[in-house]
Amino acid sequence: FWFDFYKILKAVLQNFALFFGLNVLGILLAACISKVFCRFVTAAELVVLLTLYVQGNFLVNHMPPFDGTEIVWEDYRGENIKTAIVCILIAAAVVTVAKLLGAKRFQGICMAVSAGLSGILMITLVTMTVTTGAYRERTTYYALENGQYRLSQDQNFLVLLLDAVDAKTFEEVMDSDPAYTETFADFTYYPDMVGAYPWTAFSVPYILSGKWYEGEEYYLDYAAAAVDESGLFRELSERDYDIALYESDPWVTSYTYQFSNMVELQHEAYVWKYFRRAICKLGGIRYAPFFLKEYCYRAIVQTQGQHNAFVDESNPLYTWDLKEFATHMQEEEVTYQEGKCFRYYHLQGGHVPFLYDADLNTVGDSSYTETLEANIRVIGQFLDKLKQSDLYDNSVIIVMADHGFDPQNEVSAYDRQNPLFLVKGVGESHPLQTSLVPAAYEDLQDAYVRLMDGAAGDAIFPYQELSLIHISE
């Protein structure tokens, strides 16, 4: 999300003031009608409070995914039944206690329960805020779209990172059409590559830095340290490469190395009241009963729609969308600059939802294999653009994934440790070849240096003498 702790805090306090005022007004109106009705309203509020608390803390094991997968809400009818049962049981308990204890004692219990739950939630909030460092103001850098094809006639180091692409599935797609195999002529394919993390937030900083996330520090501290301590960035800087990261996720919080396409931006909501409503819905994702969660889940998109980043419309923020990347590729001319260039492009790859067919038409209900075909065609266009500009031979090119993917279980963290990895060194010319080297992302930092030194794609990992190279015809 683009917003920070202080924008959330401001919206939450305003929402709290609004709901608190409405609640006080409602209780006063109920008291004016009759004492019995006021007690009924108080009891109903207690039932709602306890139901939401149980929903948000004990009925969260079967939440719909947040990764863009299309949610079939009909599949969650069972969760609605659980919520209804909890609500009925709590209501029955409240009515029973009210009858047993009497009106005055029951009113005291309502106040005690409300204060107790409020205290628990407040302690949890403060603890999480302090331990995660969320309260600290940070500068986040965003990638602008232009300059993707401002490259060097000396040497380029280009990384195309495709999100969530499984090596074996990609290989099956390549084998299905000789044209796909021909796209990757001059490359070396590593089918036994072992990745690092199953999720993008951790794998991308690791790929670029070699620094593991041990869970002992706040994530943004880790991300900043990953940039600061990156062996790749240090080596590129020492060799005077111009470094640009085309990344749509705002995880870069350190500017130790000068990323030529990144800027610090001011952020604000377009219309504050709509943003405040969206923040309220975000809370409902966890605490609202399931029949309201579909409404609350829309807030994920709505908060992005309220993002005003104050950028020049002629140079918008970079997005990983595959079709937009292909469109921009056609629009931006290749230009040349002095010195060497490093360019990193994070693309949608095989991430859900599967929007495009093999011809990059928006269909909305495509398959994983069709999505991979679309990626291959876009990569082919990218490579052709380099060839037409006489920049292909002098470029190191890596086509890789941040992690693997299991199309049979899209939300599983398992079966994600075999990411795609294809590499071409400077000046290579041969059919697509396969290396059976037992390579791993743990070896990437040394591999990057070997590629900068002019090594071929089949000679960048240890144990090369144990490999068996197959040339794909």
Residue ranges and their predicted role:
Residues 469-473:
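Conserved small/polar residues in nucleotide/adenosyl-binding loops
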Residues 1-136:
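Transmembrane and membrane-interface helices of multi-pass
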Residues 125, 328-374, 406-419:
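Active-site His/acidic residue clusters
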Residues 158-159, 179, 374-415, 428, ...:
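Metal-dependent active-site segment of extracytoplasmic phospho-/sulfohydrolases and closely related
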Residues 31, 36-83, 90, 94, ...:
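Active-site-proximal alpha/beta segments of enzymes that process anionic O-linked groups
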